Design a protein with these regions (language model features):
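Extracellular mucin-like PTS segments
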Residues: 1-14
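Structural recognition of the beta-strand scaffold that forms the well-ordered cores
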Residues: 35-39, 155, 484-488
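Noncatalytic, helix-rich "gating/capping" subdomain that lines the substrate-entry/channel surface
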Residues: 71-381, 385, 440-444, 449-450
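Active-site-surrounding "flap" and adjacent substrate/cofactor-binding loops of secreted or lumenal enzymes
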Residues: 14-17, 31-34, 39-106
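Active-site-adjacent "gating/activation" loops or surface patches in catalytic cores
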Residues: 306-317, 436-496
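Short, well-ordered surface patches within globular domains
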Residues: 28, 215, 396, 400-423
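Hydrophobic/aromatic-rich, well-ordered segments within soluble, folded domains that form packed cores
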Residues: 25-46, 169-191, 400
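Secretory-pathway/luminal and periplasmic proteins that interact with or process carbohydrate-rich
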Residues: 45-47, 221-231, 388, 415-426
């Protein structure tokens, strides 16, 4: 029977866990052979309080998160950022100024809703939603082709679903706490829109006494036909080269060429015609039924479809308008993430900025202040030495046959490293001038800019130097499609 290793004080005995590793988290009441996680971490977990406005904490990462947030806060103050990248200050100031949001009122949101509802055909309406990055029926996005990583392809997947995975849309989940929370959120938004909205918005919700369940019924038709998280781990499931013509034939009530034109996708490109479906083909059958029953102007449930679009827009834009909508956003966010207190406005505004093209602008300023070229060179040298050591291990691994060793050696030789920050910073010059007094206009401009930039990648070779993580992030990743490692500047500091 395995026993718990003892920490010997005999100098002639090498301890199983060197003191320099740090024993502050070890709980010796657990047998490491049976439950190593609690053996190594339980004391730290018990002794470390979780703040009411946090849903998780990580010892090493959390320390650096807080450190970096303090540095970013300094960089975003008007007197520090205006002289370098004024758009940062404009966007962040417009987000933090809740007083102006309340003074401006709900009209910017209502204007956006009116614009969406007057787009025209179903195809134009869905395209309007997608150009502004609001969920509606499905999603189209640009990805690397898994069979030719040098080329981007247009991909099609689920979209416009307010719950995170397939299981939440199954019939037996309707009374689960997560689904009930979502229904309450939709119901709260609908009531706020009826109270504060204009005549057009009120007319959509008039008589829809159970609109939250009605919207969930619509979503469920699509949601139950997506891959489960487990199924999504199978690359074969995630790559169905159905082609643009195949999708067109399967959903006869939707003009995909008209949609593509309205959303800004060039259908003459091979990378568009070779469209890849990331869901089961039955999702397209479900989409066809939703189009007939909900989306078409003469559909029996067309008003529910409009309510679905308006609620998805409102949920996405709630943080950027008046206090009642901001409060509902916070309430629902706390329920979803298990918090009992609100995060400060700073954290939300920082997150929205980071998810915009200005996130890279903020990273550029962070690197200028906190990550020198000498630090980058030192990190590059460290990674190269680690790879060299790994190469020696490959050569001395007797359990590998020669063919496997040669393949691993070739992969190691061809691996590229991206250290600290991009060699070429992406430009946000095409982004419309942002204003400190118009947050919603800023948000909409950023969303359209991101969509336009993504579609511009179609028909061009994949930019293998593009970063999908901000350089100030405390994280790192490996991209298997291009065999590259990315180490942001944010993680290249102690204790990492």
């Amino acid at each position: 029977t395995p026993t718990t290793p003892s920490r010997s004080t005999d100098a002639s005995t090498t301890p199983l866990i060197p003191e320099k590793v740090g024993l502050f988290g070890v709980d010796e009441s657990f047998n490491p052979c049976n439950d190593f996680y609690n053996y190594a971490c339980n004391k730290w977990a018990v002794d470390t309080p979780l703040a009411h406005n946090e849903s998780y904490i990580s010892y090493s990462f959390h320390t650096l998160f807080l450190k970096n947030e303090r540095e970013l806060s300094k960089l975003l103050s008007p007197d520090r950022s205006t002289g370098y990248f004024p758009q940062l200050s404009e966007f962040f100031s417009s987000c933090m100024d809740e007083g102006t949001l309340d003074t401006v009122g709900l009209q910017p949101l209502l204007t956006a809703v009116d614009e969406m509802l007057s787009a025209g055909s179903v195809e134009s309406t869905v395209a309007w939603m997608h150009r502004h990055q609001f969920g509606a029926l499905f999603s189209t996005y640009v990805t690397q082709s898994p069979v030719n990583s040098s080329l981007p392809v247009l991909s099609l997947g689920t979209g416009g679903l307010g719950l995170p995975s397939k299981s939440y849309y199954e019939a037996d989940a309707r009374n689960s706490s997560r689904v009930v929370a979502y229904l309450n959120h939709l119901d709260s938004l609908a009531k706020l829109l009826v109270t504060h909205g204009n005549a057009q918005v009120r007319s959509i919700f008039a008589g829809l006494d159970n609109v939250a369940n009605d919207v969930l019924d619509l979503e469920s038709r699509l949601g139950v036909e997506q891959w489960s998280p487990e199924e999504s781990r199978d690359p074969q499931h995630m790559y169905d080269a159905i082609g643009f013509a195949g999708v067109d034939a399967r959903t006869t009530s939707f003009d995909w060429s008209a949609y593509a034109s309205a959303v800004g996708i060039d259908t003459s490109l091979p990378s568009v015609q070779q469209l890849v479906l990331h869901e089961p083909r039955t999702m397209l059958d479900a989409l066809q039924s939703v189009l007939v029953d909900y989306a078409e102007p003469t559909a029996p449930h067309n008003r529910i479809f409009k309510a679905y679009l308006v609620l998805h827009m409102t949920s996405a834009l709630a943080p950027f308008v008046t206090a009642p909508f901001r409060d509902e956003y916070l309430r629902y966010s706390n329920v979803v993430h298990g918090r009992t207190e609100d995060l400060s406005r700073f954290y939300y505004c920082l997150g929205w900025l980071e998810n915009s093209p200005l996130g890279m602008v903020l990273s550029q300023l962070y690197v200028l202040r906190h990550f020198s070229h000498d630090q980058r060179a030192a990190a590059e040298d460290l990674v190269e030495r680690v790879q060299a050591a790994f190469g020696k291990r490959l050569d001395n691994s007797a359990w590998l046959d020669e063919q496997s060793r040669a393949g691993a050696r070739e992969k190691l030789t061809k691996m590229t490293n991206h250290i600290g920050f991009p060699d070429v910073w992406p430009s946000a010059e095409g982004l419309a001038l942002l204003r400190s007094d118009s947050l919603l206009a800023n948000v909409m401009a950023v969303r359209v800019f991101q969509t336009t930039e993504a579609h511009a990648e179609l028909g061009k070779p994949v930019d293998q130097g593009k970063w999908y993580m901000l350089p100030h992030e405390v994280n790192a990743y490996y991209d298997p499609l291009i065999n590259s490692i990315f180490f942001p500047a944010g993680i290249l500091q102690a204790p990492f």
